[in-house]
């Protein structure tokens, strides 16, 4: 269901920020700021520090992203 041109990467939550924003360290070492996608917010999926997540980013701004999946 991903749109054309979006980049999906795996990462780990390293910090929790206000307004459901998170700091995520990607597998390649980069750190991005990410928010929760609407479906995860609607289904009350909780994300804690240390969780493995899948982050979707646009090629236009690689410093921000959207968390689309939390691994168990």
Curated annotation (Swiss-Prot):
Xref: Pfam families: eIF-1a (PF01176)
GO CC annotations on file: cytosol
Major place of residence: cytoplasm
Subcellular location: Cytoplasm
This protein's record includes keyword RNA-binding: yes
GO-annotated molecular function: ribosome binding; rRNA binding; translation initiation factor activity
InterPro entries: NA-bd_OB-fold (IPR012340), RNA-binding_domain_S1_IF1 (IPR006196), S1_domain (IPR003029), TIF_IF1 (IPR004368)
Keywords: Cytoplasm, Initiation factor, Protein biosynthesis, RNA-binding, rRNA-binding
Name recorded for this polypeptide: Translation initiation factor IF-1
